[in-house]
Amino acid sequence: MKSAEWFEASTEEERVEIQRKVARKVRLEPLDDVDAVAGVDVSYRGEEYRAAAVVLDPETYEVLDRRVVHGTTDVPYEPGFLAFREGPPALEALEGLDFDLLFVHGHGVAHPRRAGLASHLGVALDVPTIGVARRPLVGRSKEEPSRIGDTTPLVHRGEVVGYLVRTDAEARPVVVSPGHRCNLEDAVRWTLRLVRVGKWPEPLRLADLLSRRGASRVEGESRGAGVRR
């Protein structure tokens, strides 16, 4: 299938079938060397969207590349089917960018059919992806992690599908799950490694800023942020 075809469905039955195909393609495996990390996010105002992607050097946090696209969509938000709304704008924003790992504001395999937005994008582009979300879509955890760096497994149908990860002492934990070509351990490790300010990994934080506020703000934020210890 071509990249865009992973997101083309007109009925719920078609969306579910595509998700099942995505889940069958997903591979959870250790990451190879990572020299460039991307983040992608989509912001909305009504039916209008602004999708942004930012590529960083994971050692220096230098912004290596970025891209913003605008458009409209008539695909509504439905829990469990976010990929069909945000996937096409995200694909467009990522077009032409080079990176070794992609962070996605959404879920990977921590999804009812193991096929969240991060898994969709990973399979469509055949790149390693990690999903980072605000709250669980599926699964249960025994407790919230209490200290920065602590994690708690998220279990769904007897399987660990992700982790609650405490990345900020003042904010709720994020939900981390691998999307494609990445395993659970590397998803957590890279998420914690790349948090500098607030609760989100830096590629996602800057992609969110770019989608909402523009390139000049991203450049200033990137230069001014200190590395968290």
From Swiss-Prot:
Protein name (record): Endonuclease V
Q: Which UniProt keywords apply?
A: Cytoplasm, DNA damage, DNA repair, Endonuclease, Hydrolase, Nuclease
Q: Which GO terms describe its molecular function?
A: deoxyribonuclease V activity; RNA endonuclease activity, producing 5'-phosphomonoesters; single-stranded RNA binding
* Tagged with keyword DNA damage: yes
Site note Interaction with target DNA, residues: 77
Give the taxonomic lineage as stored in the record.
Archaea, Methanobacteriati, Methanobacteriota, Methanomada group, Methanopyri
List all disulphide bridges recorded for this chain: none
What's the family? Belongs to the endonuclease V family.
Q: Which reaction does it catalyse?
A: Endonucleolytic cleavage at apurinic or apyrimidinic sites to products with a 5'-phosphate
Please report the organism this UniProt entry assigns to the protein. Answer: Methanopyrus kandleri (strain AV19 / DSM 6324 / JCM 9639 / NBRC 100938)
> Which biological process annotations from GO are given for this protein?
DNA repair
